[in-house]
């Protein structure tokens, strides 16, 4: 599902619309443009191990905008503050706990204020304390950005605390 929404896989049947665009009719350039309007929080964060937390969050801004360094600095610190980690900007991924790494990855995912956020198992591998520490920022950031979020997870209990709607998918079909 997430691969189709992200444009990595074409729909085999029917029509899939993402941020108002019919995915099956888009060329590669249009798919890349559509992807700039969305972001993804990967299951285990996927932070660049040789970059600090600050540099991980700044990466997209440097790659996809022409913002000045001073503006990037302010925005990165704002994104880290939004996930409760402004003071961790200098830390390397190896110095972060699992919950902290997931929150840095969340700050990186929201760096460009996406319209659509996708989360791949955001609660996987987290201890009970870290579960709530990642769940609440997901909900707050979704509301603040006015974004649509899609959370793929097996952790129904945690999901119910932060979602507006829940769909159950089995064997490629929505069952509830």
Regions found by a protein language model. Give the residues of each.
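Conserved ABC transporter NBD signature motif
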Residues: 14-22
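Conserved ABC ATPase "signature" region
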Residues: 21-22, 69-88
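Conserved ABC ATPase signature
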Residues: 92-96, 100
